[in-house]
């Protein structure tokens, strides 16, 4: 990422109620930690959004200092996703995006909905590392 350009990350899953919400929260934190608010945009959404973020996700993210209780899953369009530089899907997407303009990465993560809390924590920790790695890839000077 150069100082004069904006990079846009998209995090998407079907319901936008678990994995993509965790990814977004970690990306927002990483963007702030690295002082990249002016150069990194973050988009999140689902192809068939749920009514609320999964309770398990709210709880395990609360353990890490994130309050996702007021977040609302939202629908995301193909046009929105094609405006991203990178789109991370969570392993459940059948999106067909223009591969010439968007780098789509399938993170193939288990769905936390209905899982035991320890499994949800493992998914959370995996997501956190993937997000940090993504920022390292695009901002290696930190």
Curated annotation (Swiss-Prot):
The keyword Iron-sulfur does not apply. Disruption phenotype: Deletion of the arsADRC operon results in increased sensitivity to arsenite and antimonite but not arsenate. Keywords: Arsenical resistance, Oxidoreductase, Plasmid. Induction: Weakly induced by arsenite, antimonite and arsenate. It comes from the Archaea. The keyword Oxidoreductase applies. GO terms for molecular function: oxidoreductase activity. It holds the Pfam family LMWPc. SUPFAM superfamilies: Phosphotyrosine protein phosphatases I. One of its GO terms (biological process) is response to arsenic-containing substance. Its EC number is 1.20.4.-. InterPro entries: Ptyr_pPase, Ptyr_pPase_sf. As expression is low no effect on arsenate resistance has been found. Belongs to the low molecular weight phosphotyrosine protein phosphatase family. Reduces arsenate [As(V)] to arsenite [As(III)]. This is Putative arsenate reductase.
């Amino acid at each position: 990422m150069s100082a004069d350009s904006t990079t846009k990350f998209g995090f998407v899953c079907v319901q936008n109620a678990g994995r993509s919400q965790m990814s977004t929260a970690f990306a927002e934190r990483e963007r702030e930690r690295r002082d990249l608010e002016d150069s990194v945009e973050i988009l999140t959404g689902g192809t068939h959004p749920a009514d609320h973020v999964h309770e398990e996700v709210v709880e395990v993210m609360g353990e890490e200092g994130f309050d996702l209780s007021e977040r609302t899953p939202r629908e995301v369009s193909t046009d929105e996703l094609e405006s991203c530089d990178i789109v991370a899907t969570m392993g459940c997407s059948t999106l067909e995006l223009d591969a010439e303009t968007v780098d789509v990465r399938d993170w193939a993560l288990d769905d936390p909905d209905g899982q035991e809390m320890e499994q949800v924590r493992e998914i959370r920790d995996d997501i956190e590392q993937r997000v940090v790695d993504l920022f390292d890839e695009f901002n290696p000077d930190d």
